[in-house]
Protein backbone atom coordinates (compact mmCIF):
# COMPACT_ATOMS: atom_id res chain seq x y z
CA UNK A 1 0.00 0.00 0.00
CA UNK A 2 1.51 3.30 -1.12
CA UNK A 3 1.15 6.25 1.25
CA UNK A 4 2.84 9.59 1.66
CA UNK A 5 5.26 10.02 4.54
CA UNK A 6 2.69 12.21 6.30
CA UNK A 7 0.02 9.51 5.94
CA UNK A 8 2.49 6.89 7.18
CA UNK A 9 3.11 9.01 10.27
CA UNK A 10 -0.61 9.27 11.05
CA UNK A 11 -1.16 5.57 10.38
CA UNK A 12 1.81 4.63 12.57
CA UNK A 13 0.57 6.76 15.47
CA UNK A 14 -2.87 5.17 15.17
CA UNK A 15 -1.39 1.66 15.26
CA UNK A 16 0.60 2.64 18.35
CA UNK A 17 -2.65 3.45 20.14
CA UNK A 18 -2.45 7.23 19.95
CA UNK A 19 -5.81 8.97 20.01
CA UNK A 20 -4.93 12.58 20.78
CA UNK A 21 -2.21 14.90 19.46
CA UNK A 22 -1.48 18.38 20.78
CA UNK A 23 -0.05 20.76 18.22
CA UNK A 24 0.16 23.97 16.24
CA UNK A 25 0.54 24.00 12.43
CA UNK A 26 3.20 25.70 10.34
CA UNK A 27 4.76 25.48 6.90
CA UNK A 28 7.21 22.63 7.48
CA UNK A 29 4.59 20.37 9.08
CA UNK A 30 1.62 21.18 6.79
CA UNK A 31 1.71 17.85 4.88
CA UNK A 32 1.07 16.07 8.18
CA UNK A 33 -1.83 18.38 8.96
CA UNK A 34 -3.33 17.60 5.55
CA UNK A 35 -3.11 13.90 6.40
CA UNK A 36 -4.52 14.35 9.91
CA UNK A 37 -7.93 15.24 8.50
CA UNK A 38 -8.20 11.79 6.90
CA UNK A 39 -6.94 9.92 9.97
CA UNK A 40 -8.60 8.67 13.17
CA UNK A 41 -6.43 10.96 15.30
CA UNK A 42 -7.97 13.78 17.29
CA UNK A 43 -5.85 16.92 17.01
CA UNK A 44 -6.09 19.47 19.82
CA UNK A 45 -5.08 22.92 18.61
CA UNK A 46 -3.02 24.87 21.13
CA UNK A 47 -2.26 28.59 21.24
CA UNK A 48 1.50 28.12 21.61
CA UNK A 49 3.83 25.18 20.99
CA UNK A 50 5.06 25.24 24.58
CA UNK A 51 1.50 24.49 25.61
CA UNK A 52 1.47 21.48 23.27
CA UNK A 53 4.42 19.84 25.04
CA UNK A 54 3.05 20.64 28.49
CA UNK A 55 -0.34 19.20 27.50
CA UNK A 56 1.27 16.07 26.04
CA UNK A 57 3.25 15.72 29.27
CA UNK A 58 0.11 16.05 31.39
CA UNK A 59 -1.76 13.63 29.13
CA UNK A 60 1.02 11.06 29.56
CA UNK A 61 0.95 11.40 33.35
CA UNK A 62 -2.84 11.17 33.53
CA UNK A 63 -3.30 8.34 31.03
CA UNK A 64 -0.24 6.24 31.75
CA UNK A 65 0.55 6.24 28.02
CA UNK A 66 2.75 8.32 25.75
CA UNK A 67 1.85 11.94 25.04
CA UNK A 68 2.34 13.31 21.52
CA UNK A 69 3.05 16.94 20.60
CA UNK A 70 3.57 18.43 17.14
CA UNK A 71 5.03 21.66 15.78
CA UNK A 72 6.64 23.17 12.71
CA UNK A 73 10.33 23.90 12.21
CA UNK A 74 12.33 26.83 13.57
CA UNK A 75 10.38 28.88 16.13
CA UNK A 76 7.69 26.22 16.39
CA UNK A 77 10.26 23.65 17.43
CA UNK A 78 12.21 25.94 19.76
CA UNK A 79 8.98 26.93 21.51
CA UNK A 80 8.69 23.29 22.64
CA UNK A 81 11.96 23.31 24.57
CA UNK A 82 10.61 24.19 28.04
CA UNK A 83 7.97 21.46 27.87
CA UNK A 84 10.53 18.93 26.65
CA UNK A 85 12.87 19.81 29.51
CA UNK A 86 10.02 19.41 32.00
CA UNK A 87 9.22 15.95 30.65
CA UNK A 88 12.89 14.99 30.86
CA UNK A 89 13.35 16.10 34.46
CA UNK A 90 10.04 14.58 35.58
CA UNK A 91 10.51 11.30 33.67
CA UNK A 92 7.41 11.69 31.51
CA UNK A 93 7.07 9.74 28.22
CA UNK A 94 6.45 12.30 25.48
CA UNK A 95 7.11 12.06 21.74
CA UNK A 96 7.55 15.42 20.00
CA UNK A 97 7.20 15.48 16.22
CA UNK A 98 8.59 18.51 14.42
CA UNK A 99 8.60 19.48 10.78
CA UNK A 100 11.91 20.41 9.17
CA UNK A 101 12.94 22.09 5.92
CA UNK A 102 13.45 19.82 2.91
CA UNK A 103 16.54 17.64 3.10
CA UNK A 104 18.26 19.44 0.19
CA UNK A 105 18.08 22.68 2.22
CA UNK A 106 19.52 21.27 5.45
CA UNK A 107 22.55 23.24 6.59
CA UNK A 108 21.81 26.20 4.30
CA UNK A 109 20.19 28.43 6.93
CA UNK A 110 16.93 28.16 5.02
CA UNK A 111 13.79 29.94 6.20
CA UNK A 112 12.87 28.64 9.67
CA UNK A 113 15.62 26.04 9.62
CA UNK A 114 17.05 25.28 13.06
CA UNK A 115 19.09 22.38 14.40
CA UNK A 116 16.41 21.27 16.86
CA UNK A 117 18.05 17.88 17.45
CA UNK A 118 21.23 19.65 18.53
CA UNK A 119 19.30 22.06 20.75
CA UNK A 120 17.33 19.30 22.48
CA UNK A 121 20.12 16.75 22.80
CA UNK A 122 20.69 17.44 26.54
CA UNK A 123 16.96 17.34 27.35
CA UNK A 124 15.77 14.27 25.43
CA UNK A 125 16.37 10.56 25.84
CA UNK A 126 16.83 10.37 22.07
CA UNK A 127 16.26 12.53 19.01
CA UNK A 128 16.58 11.93 15.30
CA UNK A 129 16.18 13.57 11.88
CA UNK A 130 14.15 11.58 9.33
CA UNK A 131 14.75 12.49 5.69
CA UNK A 132 13.14 9.48 3.95
CA UNK A 133 9.48 8.47 3.96
CA UNK A 134 10.59 4.82 4.17
CA UNK A 135 12.11 5.43 7.63
CA UNK A 136 9.16 7.17 9.28
CA UNK A 137 7.22 4.15 10.58
CA UNK A 138 10.27 2.43 12.07
CA UNK A 139 11.57 5.65 13.64
CA UNK A 140 8.23 6.45 15.26
CA UNK A 141 7.99 2.92 16.68
CA UNK A 142 11.50 3.29 18.08
CA UNK A 143 10.58 6.66 19.59
CA UNK A 144 7.67 5.13 21.51
CA UNK A 145 9.77 2.24 22.80
CA UNK A 146 12.53 4.57 24.00
CA UNK A 147 10.16 7.13 25.56
CA UNK A 148 8.35 4.50 27.61
CA UNK A 149 11.18 2.15 28.59
CA UNK A 150 13.52 2.24 31.57
CA UNK A 151 13.30 5.70 33.07
CA UNK A 152 10.65 7.34 30.84
CA UNK A 153 11.35 10.60 29.07
CA UNK A 154 10.89 12.66 25.91
CA UNK A 155 11.97 11.72 22.38
CA UNK A 156 12.01 14.16 19.44
CA UNK A 157 11.46 13.08 15.82
CA UNK A 158 12.34 15.79 13.27
CA UNK A 159 10.88 14.98 9.82
CA UNK A 160 11.93 16.87 6.70
CA UNK A 161 9.16 18.27 4.52
CA UNK A 162 10.16 16.23 1.47
CA UNK A 163 9.99 13.03 3.56
CA UNK A 164 6.43 13.96 4.53
CA UNK A 165 5.47 14.54 0.89
CA UNK A 166 7.22 11.55 -0.70
CA UNK A 167 5.32 8.30 -1.28
CA UNK A 168 6.44 4.76 -0.56
CA UNK A 169 5.06 1.32 0.28
CA UNK A 170 3.79 1.10 3.85
CA UNK A 171 4.32 -2.21 5.64
CA UNK A 172 3.75 -1.90 9.38
CA UNK A 173 4.84 -5.45 10.17
CA UNK A 174 8.17 -4.93 8.42
CA UNK A 175 8.93 -1.64 10.17
CA UNK A 176 10.32 -3.25 13.31
CA UNK A 177 12.46 -1.02 15.55
CA UNK A 178 16.23 -1.37 15.23
CA UNK A 179 17.19 -1.06 18.87
CA UNK A 180 19.96 -2.62 20.99
CA UNK A 181 18.99 -5.58 23.20
CA UNK A 182 16.69 -4.62 26.03
CA UNK A 183 18.46 -3.99 29.30
CA UNK A 184 17.54 -6.07 32.32
CA UNK A 185 15.01 -4.32 34.53
CA UNK A 186 17.04 -5.46 37.54
CA UNK A 187 20.76 -4.87 37.36
CA UNK A 188 22.59 -5.35 40.66
CA UNK A 189 24.94 -7.85 42.24
CA UNK A 190 23.64 -10.47 44.72
CA UNK A 191 25.98 -8.98 47.33
CA UNK A 192 24.20 -5.62 47.03
CA UNK A 193 20.84 -7.31 47.53
CA UNK A 194 22.02 -9.22 50.60
CA UNK A 195 23.55 -6.04 52.02
CA UNK A 196 20.21 -4.25 51.60
CA UNK A 197 18.34 -7.10 53.31
CA UNK A 198 20.79 -7.02 56.21
CA UNK A 199 20.42 -3.27 56.63
CA UNK A 200 16.63 -3.48 56.48
CA UNK A 201 16.28 -6.21 59.08
CA UNK A 202 18.83 -4.75 61.51
CA UNK A 203 17.61 -1.15 61.46
CA UNK A 204 16.05 0.27 64.62
CA UNK A 205 14.89 3.59 63.16
CA UNK A 206 14.21 3.02 59.44
CA UNK A 207 12.36 5.47 57.22
CA UNK A 208 11.33 5.24 53.55
CA UNK A 209 11.83 8.15 51.15
CA UNK A 210 9.17 7.57 48.49
CA UNK A 211 9.50 9.19 45.07
CA UNK A 212 7.81 9.46 41.68
CA UNK A 213 9.47 6.26 40.47
CA UNK A 214 7.01 4.21 42.52
CA UNK A 215 4.12 5.47 40.41
CA UNK A 216 6.05 5.36 37.14
CA UNK A 217 6.76 1.65 37.70
CA UNK A 218 3.21 0.88 38.88
CA UNK A 219 4.58 -0.28 42.23
CA UNK A 220 1.89 1.18 44.50
CA UNK A 221 0.39 -2.15 45.59
CA UNK A 222 3.66 -3.92 46.34
CA UNK A 223 4.97 -0.76 47.98
CA UNK A 224 1.95 -0.79 50.31
CA UNK A 225 2.69 -4.43 51.16
CA UNK A 226 6.37 -3.66 51.71
CA UNK A 227 5.63 -0.76 54.05
CA UNK A 228 3.29 -2.80 56.23
CA UNK A 229 5.43 -5.92 56.19
CA UNK A 230 8.27 -3.97 57.77
CA UNK A 231 6.13 -1.43 59.67
CA UNK A 232 8.12 1.33 57.96
CA UNK A 233 7.20 5.04 58.18
CA UNK A 234 7.06 6.82 54.81
CA UNK A 235 8.05 10.37 53.85
CA UNK A 236 7.40 11.50 50.28
CA UNK A 237 8.85 13.81 47.70
CA UNK A 238 6.47 16.24 46.03
CA UNK A 239 6.08 13.98 42.99
CA UNK A 240 5.87 10.92 45.23
CA UNK A 241 2.65 12.13 46.83
CA UNK A 242 -0.11 9.76 45.80
CA UNK A 243 1.99 6.60 45.84
CA UNK A 244 0.77 5.64 49.34
CA UNK A 245 -2.62 6.34 50.97
CA UNK A 246 -2.61 9.54 53.01
CA UNK A 247 -5.04 7.88 55.44
CA UNK A 248 -2.40 5.36 56.51
CA UNK A 249 -0.81 6.07 59.94
CA UNK A 250 2.61 5.25 58.46
CA UNK A 251 2.29 8.12 55.98
CA UNK A 252 4.29 11.07 57.32
CA UNK A 253 3.58 13.33 54.36
CA UNK A 254 5.99 15.47 52.40
CA UNK A 255 9.63 15.99 53.33
CA UNK A 256 12.14 18.62 52.34
CA UNK A 257 12.05 22.38 51.91
CA UNK A 258 8.26 22.57 51.56
CA UNK A 259 7.47 19.66 53.86
CA UNK A 260 6.92 19.63 57.59
CA UNK A 261 9.88 20.33 59.89
CA UNK A 262 9.10 17.30 62.05
CA UNK A 263 9.32 15.00 59.01
CA UNK A 264 12.78 16.36 58.25
CA UNK A 265 13.77 15.91 61.91
CA UNK A 266 12.66 12.27 61.72
CA UNK A 267 14.84 11.78 58.64
CA UNK A 268 17.80 13.30 60.46
CA UNK A 269 17.29 10.90 63.39
CA UNK A 270 16.76 7.75 61.30
CA UNK A 271 19.44 5.05 61.28
CA UNK A 272 18.38 3.78 57.83
CA UNK A 273 16.90 5.58 54.84
CA UNK A 274 15.33 3.51 52.06
CA UNK A 275 15.08 5.75 48.99
CA UNK A 276 12.67 4.35 46.40
CA UNK A 277 12.40 6.00 42.98
CA UNK A 278 13.77 9.38 44.07
CA UNK A 279 16.98 11.25 43.27
CA UNK A 280 17.95 13.09 46.48
CA UNK A 281 17.06 16.46 44.96
CA UNK A 282 18.26 19.59 46.76
CA UNK A 283 14.63 20.45 47.65
CA UNK A 284 14.58 17.21 49.63
CA UNK A 285 18.02 17.09 51.19
CA UNK A 286 18.97 20.69 51.92
CA UNK A 287 22.63 20.98 52.93
CA UNK A 288 24.28 17.71 51.91
CA UNK A 289 27.05 18.23 54.46
CA UNK A 290 24.59 17.71 57.31
CA UNK A 291 21.98 15.49 55.64
CA UNK A 292 21.14 12.33 57.64
CA UNK A 293 24.74 11.79 58.70
CA UNK A 294 23.86 8.97 61.14
CA UNK A 295 21.78 6.98 58.65
CA UNK A 296 22.81 4.13 56.39
CA UNK A 297 21.20 4.45 52.99
CA UNK A 298 19.63 2.05 50.48
CA UNK A 299 18.82 3.45 47.03
CA UNK A 300 16.31 1.68 44.76
CA UNK A 301 16.57 3.47 41.41
CA UNK A 302 16.21 2.50 37.75
CA UNK A 303 18.67 5.13 36.48
CA UNK A 304 22.24 4.14 37.31
CA UNK A 305 23.42 7.74 36.84
CA UNK A 306 21.45 8.80 39.92
CA UNK A 307 23.33 6.41 42.23
CA UNK A 308 25.81 8.27 44.48
CA UNK A 309 25.26 11.43 42.42
CA UNK A 310 24.12 13.60 45.32
CA UNK A 311 24.21 11.28 48.35
CA UNK A 312 26.58 8.37 48.86
CA UNK A 313 24.65 5.18 49.64
CA UNK A 314 25.52 1.91 51.37
CA UNK A 315 23.51 -0.37 49.06
CA UNK A 316 22.32 0.41 45.52
CA UNK A 317 19.60 -1.73 43.95
CA UNK A 318 19.45 -0.62 40.32
CA UNK A 319 16.21 -1.62 38.68
CA UNK A 320 12.49 -1.14 38.29
CA UNK A 321 11.01 -0.20 41.67
CA UNK A 322 8.16 -2.70 41.46
CA UNK A 323 10.40 -5.64 40.61
CA UNK A 324 13.02 -4.76 43.23
CA UNK A 325 10.36 -4.44 45.94
CA UNK A 326 8.84 -7.76 44.90
CA UNK A 327 12.23 -9.39 45.46
CA UNK A 328 12.82 -7.66 48.80
CA UNK A 329 9.35 -8.32 50.23
CA UNK A 330 9.80 -12.04 51.11
CA UNK A 331 13.08 -11.26 52.88
CA UNK A 332 11.75 -8.38 54.98
CA UNK A 333 11.19 -9.21 58.66
CA UNK A 334 8.34 -7.57 60.56
CA UNK A 335 9.17 -5.30 63.50
CA UNK A 336 6.80 -3.51 65.88
CA UNK A 337 8.98 -0.38 66.12
CA UNK A 338 6.83 1.08 68.90
CA UNK A 339 9.58 3.30 70.30
CA UNK A 340 10.54 4.71 66.90
CA UNK A 341 6.99 5.34 65.70
CA UNK A 342 6.10 6.82 69.08
CA UNK A 343 9.08 9.16 68.88
CA UNK A 344 7.97 10.31 65.42
CA UNK A 345 4.53 11.12 66.85
CA UNK A 346 6.22 13.18 69.56
CA UNK A 347 8.22 15.05 66.93
CA UNK A 348 5.00 15.83 65.14
CA UNK A 349 3.31 17.36 68.18
CA UNK A 350 0.81 20.03 67.22
CA UNK A 351 1.98 20.35 63.64
CA UNK A 352 -0.05 22.60 61.36
CA UNK A 353 -0.73 19.63 59.10
CA UNK A 354 -2.72 17.10 61.07
CA UNK A 355 -3.13 13.40 60.46
CA UNK A 356 -5.71 12.88 57.77
CA UNK A 357 -7.19 10.12 59.94
CA UNK A 358 -8.52 12.80 62.32
CA UNK A 359 -9.92 15.15 59.69
CA UNK A 360 -13.61 15.91 60.39
CA UNK A 361 -16.00 15.60 57.49
CA UNK A 362 -16.83 19.33 57.60
CA UNK A 363 -13.86 20.80 59.45
CA UNK A 364 -12.74 24.38 58.94
CA UNK A 365 -9.77 24.74 56.61
CA UNK A 366 -7.00 27.30 56.50
CA UNK A 367 -5.02 28.16 53.34
CA UNK A 368 -2.24 25.91 54.64
CA UNK A 369 -4.55 22.94 55.04
CA UNK A 370 -6.84 23.65 52.11
CA UNK A 371 -8.15 20.53 50.43
CA UNK A 372 -11.16 21.68 48.45
CA UNK A 373 -11.70 21.47 44.74
CA UNK A 374 -14.00 24.08 43.16
CA UNK A 375 -15.58 24.88 46.52
CA UNK A 376 -16.68 21.30 47.21
CA UNK A 377 -16.47 19.68 50.63
CA UNK A 378 -13.00 18.43 51.59
CA UNK A 379 -12.35 14.78 51.06
CA UNK A 380 -12.06 13.34 54.56
CA UNK A 381 -10.33 10.03 54.03
CA UNK A 382 -9.18 9.41 50.47
CA UNK A 383 -7.48 6.13 49.68
CA UNK A 384 -6.74 4.25 46.46
CA UNK A 385 -8.77 5.88 43.71
CA UNK A 386 -8.35 7.20 40.16
CA UNK A 387 -8.77 10.79 41.38
CA UNK A 388 -6.37 13.27 39.80
CA UNK A 389 -5.68 16.74 41.18
CA UNK A 390 -3.99 19.48 39.18
CA UNK A 391 -2.83 22.89 40.37
CA UNK A 392 -0.98 25.86 39.00
CA UNK A 393 2.63 26.32 40.03
CA UNK A 394 3.98 28.34 42.93
CA UNK A 395 2.19 28.70 46.26
CA UNK A 396 -0.95 26.93 45.03
CA UNK A 397 0.94 23.73 44.29
CA UNK A 398 2.73 23.75 47.64
CA UNK A 399 -0.39 24.42 49.74
CA UNK A 400 -2.16 21.62 47.89
CA UNK A 401 0.65 19.11 48.39
CA UNK A 402 0.88 19.74 52.14
CA UNK A 403 -2.90 19.75 52.57
CA UNK A 404 -4.81 17.25 54.63
CA UNK A 405 -6.19 15.53 51.57
CA UNK A 406 -3.17 14.36 49.62
CA UNK A 407 -3.71 12.94 46.18
Question: What do the predicted segments below correspond to?
Answer:
Residues 1-338, 353, 373, 377-383, ...:
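N-terminal alpha/beta PP-like core and its mobile active-site loop of ThDP/TPP-dependent enzymes
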Residues 9, 32-34, 348-407:
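Active-site diphosphate/adenylate-binding microenvironment
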Residues 338-352:
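Internal, active-site/partner-interface "lid" segment
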Amino acid sequence: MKLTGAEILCESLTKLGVRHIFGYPGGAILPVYDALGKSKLHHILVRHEQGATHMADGYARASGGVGVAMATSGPGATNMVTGIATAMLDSSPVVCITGQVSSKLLGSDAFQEIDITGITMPITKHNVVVSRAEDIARTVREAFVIANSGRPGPVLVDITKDAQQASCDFNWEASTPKLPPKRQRINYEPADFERAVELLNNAKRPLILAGHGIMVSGAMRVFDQFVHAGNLPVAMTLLGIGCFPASDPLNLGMMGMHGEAWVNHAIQEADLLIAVGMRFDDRVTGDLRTYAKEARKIHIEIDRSEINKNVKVDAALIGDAREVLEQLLPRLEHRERGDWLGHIRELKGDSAVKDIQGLPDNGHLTPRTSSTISGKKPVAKPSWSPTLASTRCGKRSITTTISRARW
